[in-house]
Swiss-Prot record:
Binds the lower part of the 30S subunit head. Binds mRNA in the 70S ribosome, positioning it for translation. The keyword Ribonucleoprotein applies. One of its GO terms (molecular function) is mRNA binding. Keywords: Ribonucleoprotein, Ribosomal protein, RNA-binding, rRNA-binding. This is Small ribosomal subunit protein uS3. It holds the Pfam family KH_2. Part of the 30S ribosomal subunit. Forms a tight complex with proteins S10 and S14. Belongs to the universal ribosomal protein uS3 family. One of its GO terms (cellular component) is cytosolic small ribosomal subunit. The lineage of its organism: Bacteria, Bacillati, Bacillota, Bacilli, Bacillales.
Length: 218
């Protein structure tokens, strides 16, 4: 079933960690909805800032947000003006003290989210879906990936019947749990309707750290 399941969810607790890290009992549902609002707001506001991942941590009445972006300058703004405006807006949205960390992505071509969004934007700009996929694959392999698979689905080229087409290069071992596979989806809004984009990137193997347990007497 490795072909069907989300590769990131399958690896949580093995080589991946949760993107929201906090504990709650009776307030769990409210905090979960708050997380969704924060992610929705940041995704919309930073749509041009090449944001790959948003991590949320909570402690008492404080929210720590880590934004992974390929364009940190756009998120921070001139003299930190943009990130300060962002913090104030999130303070109002959540009613809590918000602290924002910015992490720069050194190799954006190895981030599935950014590759998928790039393919989607090209399709919206009437670039051939085949060309968009092949160019993305070449860039990702040049950046040092071990393998990549891309898939687009919908009314490709304005066809009457929706279909899917995928391209791949290298290996993408979905069943190997120690394989570091990044996966993401994106949507392209065209005059013929939405076209879905999926990207899997294999970045090499990660050996999970084993917790050493000391046995009494040894």
């Amino acid at each position: 079933m490795g072909q069907k399941v989300n590769p990131i969810g399958l690896r949580i607790g093995i080589i991946r960690d949760w993107e929201s890290r906090w504990y709650a009992e009776k307030d769990y549902a409210d905090l979960l909805h708050e997380d969704l609002k924060i992610r929705e707001y940041l995704t919309k506001r930073l749509s041009d800032a090449a944001v790959s991942r948003i991590e949320i941590e909570r402690a008492a009445n404080r929210v720590n947000i880590t934004i992974h972006t390929a364009k940190p300058g756009m998120v921070i703004g001139k003299g930190g003006s943009e990130v300060e405006a962002l913090r104030k807006a999130l303070n109002e949205l959540t009613g809590k003290r918000v602290h924002i960390n910015i992490v720069e992505i050194k190799k954006p071509d190895l981030e599935a989210k950014l590759v998928a969004e790039n393919i989607a934007r090209q399709i919206e700009n009437r670039v051939s879906f085949r060309r968009a996929q092949k160019q993305a694959i070449q860039r990702t392999m040049r950046a040092g990936a071990k393998g990549i698979k891309t898939m687009v689905s919908g009314r490709l080229g304005g066809a009457d019947i929706a279909r899917s087409e995928h391209y791949s290069e290298g290996t993408v071992p979905l069943h190997t749990l120690r394989a570091d596979i990044d996966y993401a989806t994106a949507e392209a809004d065209t005059t013929y309707g939405k076209i879905g984009v999926k990207v899997w990137i294999y970045r090499g193997e990660v050996l999970p750290t084993k917790k050493k347990t000391e046995e009494g007497g040894n």
